[in-house]
Structure formats: C-alpha cells, structure tokens
Swiss-Prot record:
Positions bound to heme c: C15, C18, H19, M61
GO CC, any one term: chloroplast thylakoid lumen
PROSITE patterns hit by this protein: CYTC
Protein name: Cytochrome c6
GO molecular function, one term: iron ion binding
Modified how: Binds 1 heme c group covalently per subunit.
Family: Belongs to the cytochrome c family. PetJ subfamily.
Amino acid sequence: SADLALGKQTFEANCAACHAGGNNSVIPDHTLRKAAMEQFLQGGFNLEAITYQVENGKGAMPAWSGTLDDDEIAAVAAYVYDQASGDKW
C-alpha cells in the first residue's frame, strides 16, 4: 500500500498551493472532496482516476509525471483518496 505520510508531505509541498484543505483555488467547485470528484473527475472517484489526473493534469492543473516520481505520485493519490473517502478535508 502507498505511504500516506509521504503522500501528505508530497501534497503539502506540491499541491497545497491550489488545493490547501482539499479546496481548489482555480475552480472553486472542483474540490478534492468525494462528491466533487464523483461529479467532475474523469473516471469518477477512485484511486486510478486520481492517479491519472495527478500524472497528466487537466486544464489549469499541470501534469506532475515529470516532476514527481512514481512513488510520490502513488502516495499523493492515496493520500487524496484517503482524505476524501474519510471526509477528512
């Protein structure tokens, strides 16, 4: 299983500028909460869809595949999934 501590660290260092607290500073209704991801995330709310979005980006969100390594991507996707599925944002 992915490392949630690494995921949190990766999120805070790379994602929180736009997604602090599970929010979205660019498109306010496209948050990282489960209901929003079910509605807006291509592929729905699941680990694979979150991983794909992190790797490839979309719209204003950059692709992170060239910046983060595979372990960091897996960890940050697992962290986002865990936060959202547990309603922790």
